[in-house]
Amino acid sequence: MNGALSGARTLLYKEVLRFWKVSFQTVAAPVLTAVLYLLIFGHVLEDHVKVYDRISYTAFLVPGLVMMSVLQNAFANSSSSIIQSKIMGSLVFVLLTPLSHWAWFVAYVGSSVVRGLVVGLGVFIVTLAFARPEFAAPLWIVVFALLGAALLATLGLIAGLWA
């Protein structure tokens, strides 16, 4: 059992390192994209859309943009990793390792969740300069971000294997 955990941890580290090496493309670009969405839609629609009395339209957009970034990047990480490995022919080396299917699954999904949460946190930190959203239940925000990222990472894994 300890060997399986070691292998899963190593594969998780490899996958996190894979997206972190090109962090400008995998982290900074999605953060910039979300900020551009916020600036464009927030600026254009701020005066025309009234959401709630106490909440500005820009503050209303921030949680949706954060969650959109988390979900998109969790899906993109797992699917692109599998597809790139298939194209380059290196997937066979991962499949030949003495890892269980669960260890393999946890490593790929875990790295995708990490990327999704890192991008989501980056979007949230950058958007604080434009709006101050209020949170009624911060614990539920974290739970939904984790579960949503895991779900989309799993769907990305399926899409990558199927493609």
Protein language model regions, located:
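Hydrophobic transmembrane alpha-helices and immediately adjacent juxtamembrane helices
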Residues: 1-163
